[in-house]
Amino acid sequence: MIGNHFKKKFSKRPPPGIIITAAKERIFENIISTYGTAAPVQTQSFKIEKYEILKPIKYNQKVKKGDVIANLKNRKIIAQFDGIIGKREFSEDLEVSKSSILINLEDTSSIYCDVDIPEIFVPFIKVGLPVDIKFSGYKDKIYKGNVDSFASRISEETRSLATRIKMDNLSGEILPGSFLEISIKYDVRKSLSIPDTSTIVEGENVFIYKVDEKNKALKTKITTGDRYIGFVEVLNGLN
């Protein structure tokens, strides 16, 4: 008797709870992913014979336009713009490298990166498009840039469009020659979104359950767009 009493009282499970979530507007965007090499916005090179040098040259130092970079026997090298002094050896010619040095003056306050955009994405490329930039030196940091310019025609050899990305680099964290990961954003828009787990796919159709003013769940057909981090874009079907 006791067993039957508890069986009748507790054998039925309560209906599962329903989680109701309001549709919200979110930012959706399409991304073109590519890569390239960082280059200084301005650079100037000077070949100097070692016997000319009167005073040691201070490398990796910031200079202003008009500063003296190097005092030589018969001349002075003057900075034509603000930048950083660097040195590069003539590694390809050992005889020359014994007697000469190559000084670089580089303006790294801004960095540019030339990339090739596949032909299929060319209609979306516009000057000023936002760009996210990453490089291995700071893996978790995202730098911001934009599309600065692009070629007037598509390359027949690569079927791509030469495009220049530019970014501020006042911190000096990105060095010329760094390998950069580029994400160009286009068609950035604010759209209605819902959790992707709330959708029901039946063949080519997508449905959700929408709660009406009487607190009843109505099966509703919707048209979806892109997906982004657990959410799906709703193009039609929800007001």
Features from the language model and the residues they span:
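Acidic, gly/proline-rich low-complexity N-terminal segments at the extreme N terminus
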Residues: M1-Y35, A39, S45, F124, ...
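Short beta-strand segments of a lipoyl-like beta-sandwich/carrier module
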Residues: I19, Q42-K64, R75-S91, V96, ...
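Conserved hydrophobic positions within beta-strands
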Residues: A23, G36-A38, E52-L54, I85, ...
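Residue-level recognition of beta-strand microenvironments
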Residues: V41, P56, R88, L105-T108, ...
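Short hydrophobic beta/alpha edge segments that flank linear recognition/processing sites
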Residues: S45, N60-I78, L94-V115, P130-D132, ...
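Acidic- and glycine-rich mobile interface elements
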Residues: L54, K166, N205-N239
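Structural microfeature recognizing short secondary-structure transition sites
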Residues: K126, F135, K141-F207, G230
